[in-house]
């Protein structure tokens, strides 16, 4: 024995791998016997050391990692940012999920790596460290759970739980973490049980399929082989692993010298020589051909040389060794072991992290932007995708770094950006080879709140199937859930009202009878307009009506408009009025009165006469908000001031008005009458009882209040026509909105004014007492100044209203005197007496109380009782004659020393009254009056600016203020709504004499999918274009069910009409985009202001020809003077929709249409999809103020902001709009001059191909399914998932992407190769090439699964099994042979031999069998019957008369014979005389073989295209494995 001093002392810990290497070298050097002796000594030494060390494990030995705290904090911060982006709608749910998994996975992995170095540095002799890292007990992942963190877990359904487990077992888990980890532990227990059984069964099947494979012969005589060459990117380690233990299939030459001969087994020395040779001459070295079990020519056994060295002791495998069973167990055993690993880490979510390229130094990065295009990463961040390999330079201060980025990688920085050292600049996309196990997963997104669904125009609104409600997204877009409060009642109103708001009675309830359910999915969706209700009074068409509706199936209406109060959100649009937001003049800004609503009236046919009232608005300062009714009184400025300024103007225009009156009277008469009556029907239906009685009451309305002074009376006759008629008109027009009682609504109004004046107003006497109980009030007393203006005259047409300048009265101030009126049913019992004096809140009847205190007057009529309460004090004067009745007394001036100065600060109105039965007794009522000053500060005209690009036509807008109530007129209220006293009007005028009218139309402009409406007024020469022949009997009709017929659209118009309309340039804008496909153009409608557009004949049912590009820019000015940006560039993202005329008056709606609209009026918006169906929002919605967010804009930035903000637009949270951060995401609901209101909404980003559940406007409750994503998920490479994969490969099941790809490739090869080579060569060679390729591919896949778990299995074990799975071919039906049946499965070698023997071609195709099918297709029926389906197999074998030659192990075990391996092997070997001549034949054949090799290697080009070159042998493309075929 050598001296100790010379022994090498190797001070290094020894783990399992080192031990394997040591044993392998000992066997090489000393052989088996001596090695076992040495190992025995090592064992004794180990046990001795372990005993003396007495390692024990305590809780103090679990050292936590110091950096864990800030790592977790960092991950939490990233998660928080992620959550925020998701909330803003910047990323979608799947991206959030992926990123979340990767954040926590990366944190967990980093902690795992830190753990090793932490133990090694701080405490190398730590028992935990010693145990787990030596492999003695436990492993790294289990220790990681003790001292690291678990991360994200899966729930029982396999879905990720979003809360990661941050604590480890050393620190202790919180309650929530404990419950979540229990999920994982349960999953681990169940997995272990199930998967262990699976692994065991897999082992059984593997052994079953190869149990008969025994080494029976030294050499099978094959000269085929597989080429191995390190040139194809194979690592040296893999090269060595692949070659050692194999046998060469051909001689190896370097230059002309042979360094290794055929059939020589390869040891480590020979491999080193190969490597040296390759390094010396890398390009001239030939590939090395080795023999594998695939190349063995025997059918049911294997030869020594094809198997190679035995892995146990490094010599060639011995004859009689059962290598099949060893192979099956070698593959099955690691599976059984590895399933046990899942016990602790059960359910932990893992994700693959991508390969990253980092910057080598600080500097500016540059690359060619033409070679990249923008995209989104898997995590939703912006990036650039490389088309080709990209060259990137990073310029630091002194050096230029160059980085190559491979094809299909993602660049995560911008060009010319400054990057820091080690910053991630690119992500290498993982190869999309089939080796990645991916699965398609559905992810459902559920609504997080109640709300109503809204989507952008990118969704096709027609469902995917006719009766379904699923829709596919054609491109990535947002879905929005608009917040609402749900009220579950089916007839609840869509209410935005606060106390004392003006509201339309139609919206009190939506009548359920008219809601039709057309959707098969039971959603109250599409109320198709214009359905016949089948009742006579609601017929769709009356062919005798002079003006008929032309309906083109497309309803265009406008957005809900804005009124003056924040809460007053209801659109105040009746018939054709449009409300526009205005702002006060700068001087009044300090008052902070919010926006006014301007109402525009566009008359019949959209034609405005000169001096027509074009728009008006009601100033909230002149509004009486208190409930009740009363009288308005006013005074004028002195006559001289007024007359002096205006006299000349009147003279010049006098003639003009007269002629104008004659021209237009007849033209407009008939429609106007129709308009009035039609309007009346709609309005009086609700307030029927009151109106029926009030109408006659007002004809005989009597004066209860006192007598006006004499001077007021003289001019009464002159002014009643001029002053009254317009007022009546206005009152009627306004009535629907405010529920005023229409005082002058009488039949005579429709006749001539002159005849009716006497009847209507009667004559007034100072003390007339013939048949009246009280004095009659002088209703129409006018100031004396009016008489001078009388000669100007006021022209009032039935169709349009024009102003003479008389109406610009300069009223100083006016007064409102309060009183209260109650109209009670005749039968009601009164609780107060006539002429009594009551206080405030006195009970009048059972249900009504007084709001004012004062004198009560009761008047009983035929059908009802009127009760009036006059507020104020009552005095009994001594001398009645001295009282001046009806006078207004101004407030007293304050005197400093006067104590009574506080008494009267307001104006008072003095009225003279008399007692009933006495003609002499009078008393005086002194009533408070509210004074309103008139103000000239509001300048409307500036809000309708003249356009800069205007041509020579010049429209002028003038401002007129007038008072909406006559002097001393009783203004009564039934519904106690607000009274408006002053109305400001905008009057249209122009200078050109030849222009007869101005045409107003509404232009709808669609810019970038946002629609805005503008009002356009233009001068026209003649109105003939816009009038239609009244009694034209063409077949114009409504389309009954609102689905336009695609073909017969020609019946809409007669030729003449089309010509007359088409002379004008504008047409209804196209709804077809460039590709002529239907876009999803959804128009947000306010359903209570529908407008019918004209239809112009064309091939397309819902559109006319493309808009005429010659529309001048000046036609498109906004109401607020904002020119729409770049509207002149007509491109695919801009649509200009102009509508030919405005045809909207109430009388155009026939009854059934009106009914339908009333249904819609309770709801706020309507929508149209491609199929022209109107979808309504559900009626069960309440919008509450807290759903709305106000945003006030900085004054300077408003002009810029207007171009960006549009009504109906959706804005994401945190968007920066000109010094303004949006606090909440939502839809712009109201736009004011200095602010806008958002309706809160939550965005959800959805990708292409996602499925949207439900329809537009559908009401979703919290937790309803909103959208379903389908995305690809990489399956984690956990062995528990890996084992099923291995099983699938072995079973050749087409469950996921592996097998179909392979099967598809086999099909391709089966078809292509016979085509190239022809028949009969084709089938033989085609099948062989196909089988060779599929075998290599399968080996790679199985090895990948095991290598991912660190398990090393020698390739030859897998090869033996794959050989059995792929060794059959199926006889094809292409050529009928006499030997085999079509479809019969036979071995490849048998088919070749049969073909040779018969001298005829046999047609067959390669087939991939699974291990189970392969076990049931062997030569032994006893083996098959003992595996599965015993009865079927035995019956079939008996019928066929099969013979079992008992060659395998199993058959012999079953029958109790000697198994043919080991010592029992000798019996089964029969030497054949051919063996001796074998080598001789091979020498002769070699010549032909080398030529064939060139032909047959075509297949490497054919098949290597769809595989990726990776860095190792069995994971490379198939190119290196080139089988050699010799025939």
Curated annotation (Swiss-Prot):
The residues forming the signal peptide are none
Which terms are listed as keywords in the entry?
Answer: Chloroplast, DNA-directed RNA polymerase, Metal-binding, Nucleotidyltransferase, Plastid, Transcription, Transferase, Zinc
The region called Disordered is annotated at 644-681, 712-793
Cofactor entry: Zn(2+)
Molecular-function annotations in GO? DNA binding; DNA-directed RNA polymerase activity; zinc ion binding
Q: Which InterPro entries match?
A: DNA-dir_RpoC2_beta_pp, RNA_pol_beta''_euk, RNA_pol_Rpb1_3_sf, RNA_pol_Rpb1_4, RNA_pol_Rpb1_5, Rpb1_funnel_sf
Which Pfam family is one of those matched by this entry?
RNA_pol_Rpb1_4
Task: State where Zn(2+) binds.
Answer: 220, 296, 303, 306
Question: What's noted on cofactor binding?
Answer: Binds 1 Zn(2+) ion per subunit.
Q: Which domain of life is it from?
A: Eukaryota
Q: Where is the composition biased (Acidic residues)?
A: 737-755, 763-786
Report the record's disulfide bonds: none
- Reactions mediated catalytically: RNA(n) + a ribonucleoside 5'-triphosphate = RNA(n+1) + diphosphate
Report TM segments: none
Q: What are its GO biological-process terms? A: DNA-templated transcription
**Subcellular localization, per the record?**
Plastid, Chloroplast
One GO location term (cellular component): chloroplast
Which stretches are tagged as biased composition: Basic and acidic residues?
A: 644-661, 671-681
What is the role of this chain? DNA-dependent RNA polymerase catalyzes the transcription of DNA into RNA using the four ribonucleoside triphosphates as substrates.
Which family is this sequence assigned to? Belongs to the RNA polymerase beta' chain family. RpoC2 subfamily.
| Subunit (UniProt) | In plastids the minimal PEP RNA polymerase catalytic core is composed of four subunits: alpha, beta, beta', and beta''. When a (nuclear-encoded) sigma factor is associated with the core the holoenzyme is formed, which can initiate transcription.
The protein's name in its UniProt record: DNA-directed RNA polymerase subunit beta''
């Amino acid at each position: 024995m050598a001296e100790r001093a010379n022994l090498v002392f190797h001070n290094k810990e020894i783990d399992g791998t080192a031990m394997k290497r040591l044993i392998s070298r000992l066997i090489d050097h000393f052989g088996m016997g001596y090695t076992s002796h040495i190992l025995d000594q090592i064992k004794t030494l180990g046990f001795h050391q372990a005993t003396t060390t007495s390692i024990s494990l305590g809780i103090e030995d679990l050292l936590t990692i110091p950096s864990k705290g800030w790592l977790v904090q960092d991950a939490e911060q990233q998660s928080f940012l992620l959550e925020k982006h998701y909330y803003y709608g910047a990323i979608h749910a799947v991206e959030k999920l992926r990123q979340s998994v990767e954040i926590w996975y990366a944190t967990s992995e980093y902690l795992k790596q830190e753990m090793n170095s932490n133990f090694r540095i701080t405490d190398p002799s730590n028992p935990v460290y010693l145990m787990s890292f030596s492999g003695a007990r436990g492993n790294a992942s289990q220790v990681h759970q003790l001292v690291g963190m678990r991360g994200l877990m899966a729930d029982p359904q396999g879905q990720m739980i979003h809360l990661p487990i941050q604590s480890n077992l050393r620190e202790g888990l919180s309650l929530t973490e404990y419950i979540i980890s229990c999920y994982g532990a349960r999953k681990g227990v169940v997995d272990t049980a199930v998967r262990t059984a699976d692994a065991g069964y897999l082992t059984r099947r593997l052994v079953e399929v190869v149990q008969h494979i025994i080494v029976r012969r030294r050499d099978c005589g094959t000269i085929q082989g597989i080429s191995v060459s390190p040139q194809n990117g194979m690592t040296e380690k893999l090269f060595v692993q692949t070659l050692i233990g194999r046998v060469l299939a051909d001689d190896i030459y370097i230059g002309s010298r042979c360094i290794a001969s055929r059939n020589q087994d390869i040891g480590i020395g020979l491999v080193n020589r190969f490597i040296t040779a390759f390094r010396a001459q890398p390009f001239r070295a030939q590939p090395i051909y080795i023999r594998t079990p695939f190349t063995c020519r025997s059918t049911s056994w294997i030869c020594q040389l094809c198997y190679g060295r035995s892995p146990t002791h490094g010599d060639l495998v011995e004859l009689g060794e059962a290598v099949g069973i060893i192979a099956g167990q070698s593959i099955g055993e690691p599976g059984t072991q590895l399933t046990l690993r899942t016990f602790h880490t059960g359910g932990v979510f893992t994700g693959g992290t991508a390969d990253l390229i980092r910057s080598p130094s600080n500097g500016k990065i540059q690359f060619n932007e033409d070679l990249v295009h923008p995209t989104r990463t898997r995590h939703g961040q912006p990036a650039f995708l490389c088309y080709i390999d990209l060259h990137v330079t990073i310029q630091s201060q002194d050096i230029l770094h160059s980085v190559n980025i491979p094809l299909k990688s993602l660049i995560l920085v911008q060009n010319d950006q400054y990057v820091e050292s080690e910053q991630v600049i690119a992500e290498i996309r993982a190869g999309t080879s089939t080796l990645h196990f991916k699965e398609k997963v559905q992810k459902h997104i559920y609504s997080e709140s109640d709300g109503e669904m809204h989507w952008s125009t990118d969704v096709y609104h027609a469902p995917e199937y006719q009766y379904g409600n699923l829709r596919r997204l054609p491109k990535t877009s947002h879905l929005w859930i608009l917040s609402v409060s749900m009220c579950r009642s089916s007839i609840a109103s869509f209410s935005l009202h606060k106390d004392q708001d003006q509201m339309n009675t139609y919206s009190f309830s939506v009548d359920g009878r008219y809601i039709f359910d057309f959707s098969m999915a039971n959603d109250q969706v599409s109320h198709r307009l214009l359905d016949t209700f089948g009742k006579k009074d609601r017929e769709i068409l009356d062919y005798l009506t002079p003006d008929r509706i032309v309906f083109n199936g497309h309803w265009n209406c406008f957005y809900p408009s804005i009124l003056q109060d924040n809460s007053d959100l209801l659109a105040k649009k009746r018939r054709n009025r449009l409300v526009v937001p205005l702002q006060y003049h700068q001087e009044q800004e300090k008052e902070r009165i919010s926006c006014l609503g301007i109402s525009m009236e566009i008359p019949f046919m959209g034609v405005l006469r000169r001096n027509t009232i074009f728009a008006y608005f009601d100033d909230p300062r002149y509004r009486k908000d208190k409930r009740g009714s009363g009288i308005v009184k006013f005074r004028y400025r002195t006559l001289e001031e007024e007359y002096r300024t205006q006299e000349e103007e009147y003279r010049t225009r006098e003639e003009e008005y007269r002629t104008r009156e004659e021209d237009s009277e007849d033209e407009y008469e008939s429609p106007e009458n129709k308009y009035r009556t039609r309007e009346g029907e709609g309005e009086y239906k609700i307030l029927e009882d009151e109106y029926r009685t009030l109408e006659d009451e007002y004809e005989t309305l009597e004066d209860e209040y006192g007598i006006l002074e004499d001077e007021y009376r003289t001019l009464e006759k002159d002014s009643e026509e001029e002053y009254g008629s317009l007022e009546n008109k206005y009152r009627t027009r306004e009535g629907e909105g405010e529920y005023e009682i229409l005082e002058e609504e009488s039949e005579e109004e429709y006749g001539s004014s002159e005849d009716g004046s006497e009847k209507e107003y009667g004559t007034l006497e100072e003390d007339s007492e013939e048949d009246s109980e009280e004095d009659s009030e002088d209703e129409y007393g006018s100031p004396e100044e009016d008489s001078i203006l009388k000669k100007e005259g006021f022209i009032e047409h039935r169709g349009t209203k024009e102003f003479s300048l008389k109406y610009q009265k300069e009223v100083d101030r006016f007064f409102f005197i309060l009183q209260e009126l109650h109209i009670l049913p005749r039968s009601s019992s009164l609780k107060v007496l006539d002429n009594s004096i009551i206080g405030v809140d006195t009970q009048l009847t059972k249900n009504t109380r007084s709001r004012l205190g004062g004198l009560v007057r009761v008047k009983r009529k035929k059908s009802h009782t009127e009760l009036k309460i006059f507020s104020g004090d009552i005095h009994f004067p001594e001398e009645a004659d001295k009282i001046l009745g009806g006078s207004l007394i101004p407030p007293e001036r304050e005197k400093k020393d006067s104590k009574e100065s506080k008494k009267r600060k307001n104006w008072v109105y003095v009225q003279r009254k008399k007692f009933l039965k006495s003609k002499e007794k009078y008393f005086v009522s002194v009533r408070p009056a509210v004074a309103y000053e008139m103000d000239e500060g509001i300048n409307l005209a500036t809000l309708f600016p003249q356009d800069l690009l205007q041509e020579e036509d010049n429209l002028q807008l003038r401002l007129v203020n007038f008072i909406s109530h006559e002097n001393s007129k009783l203004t009564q209220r039934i519904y106690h709504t607000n009274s408006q006293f002053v109305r400001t009007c905008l009057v249209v005028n122009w200078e050109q004499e030849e222009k007869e009218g101005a045409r107003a139309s509404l232009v709808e402009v669609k810019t970038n999918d946002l629609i805005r409406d503008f009002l356009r007024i233009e001068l026209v020469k003649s109105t003939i274009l816009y009038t239609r022949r009244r009694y034209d009997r063409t077949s114009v009709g409504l389309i009954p069910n609102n689905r336009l017929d695609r073909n017969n659209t020609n019946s809409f118009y007669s030729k003449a009409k089309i010509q007359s309309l088409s002379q004008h340039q504008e047409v209804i804008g196209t709804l077809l985009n460039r590709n002529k496909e239907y876009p999803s153009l959804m128009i947000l409608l306010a359903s209570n202001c529908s407008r019918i557009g004209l239809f112009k004949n064309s091939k397309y049912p819902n559109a006319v020809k493309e808009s005429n590009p010659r529309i001048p820019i000046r036609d498109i000015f906004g109401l607020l003077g904002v020119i729409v940006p770049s509207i002149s560039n007509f491109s695919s993202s801009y649509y200009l929709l102009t509508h030919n005329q405005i045809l909207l008056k109430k009388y155009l709606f026939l009854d059934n249409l009106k009914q339908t609209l009333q249904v819609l009026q309770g709801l706020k918006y309507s929508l149209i999809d491609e199929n022209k169906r109107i979808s309504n929002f559900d009626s069960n919605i309440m919008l509450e103020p807290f759903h709305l967010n106000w945003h006030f804009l900085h004054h300077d930035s408003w002009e810029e902001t207007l171009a960006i903000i549009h009504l109906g637009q959706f804005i994401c949270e945190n968007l920066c709009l000109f010094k303004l951060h949006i606090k909440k995401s939502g839809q712009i609901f109201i736009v004011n001059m200095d602010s806008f209101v958002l309706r809160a909404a939550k965005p959800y980003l959805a990708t292409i191909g996602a499925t949207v559940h439900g329809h537009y406007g559908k009401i979703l409750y919290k937790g309803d399914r909103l959208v379903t994503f389908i995305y690809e998920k990489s399956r984690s490479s956990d062995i528990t998932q890996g084992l099923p994969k291995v099983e699938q490969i072995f079973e050749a099941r087409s469950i996921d992407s592996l097998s179909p790809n392979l099967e598809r490739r086999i099909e391709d090869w089966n078809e292509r190769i016979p085509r190239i080579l022809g028949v009969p060569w084709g089938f033989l060679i085609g099948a062989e090439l196909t089988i060779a390729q599929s075998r290599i591919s399968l080996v790679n896949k199985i090895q990948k699964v095991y290598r991912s778990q660190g398990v090393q299995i020698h390739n030859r074990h897998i090869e033996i099994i794959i050989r059995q799975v792929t060794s059959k071919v199926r006889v094809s039906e292409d050529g009928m042979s006499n030997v085999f049946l079509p479809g019969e499965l036979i071995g490849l070698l048998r088919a070749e031999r049969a073909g040779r023997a018969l001298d005829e071609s046999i047609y067959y195709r390669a087939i991939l069998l699974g291990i189970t099918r392969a076990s049931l297709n062997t030569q032994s029926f006893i083996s098959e019957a003992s595996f599965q389906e015993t009865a079927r197999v035995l019956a079939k074998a008996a019928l066929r008369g099969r013979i079992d030659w008992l060659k395998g192990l199993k058959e012999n075990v079953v029958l109790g014979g000697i198994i043919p391996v080991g010592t029992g092997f000798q019996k089964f070997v029969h030497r054949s005389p051919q063996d001796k001549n074998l080598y001789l034949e091979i020498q002769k054949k070699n010549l032909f073989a080398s030529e064939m090799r060139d032909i047959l290697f075509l297949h490497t080009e054919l098949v290597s295209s769809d595989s990726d070159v990776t860095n190792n042998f069995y994971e490379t493309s198939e190119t290196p494995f080139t089988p050699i075929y010799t025939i």
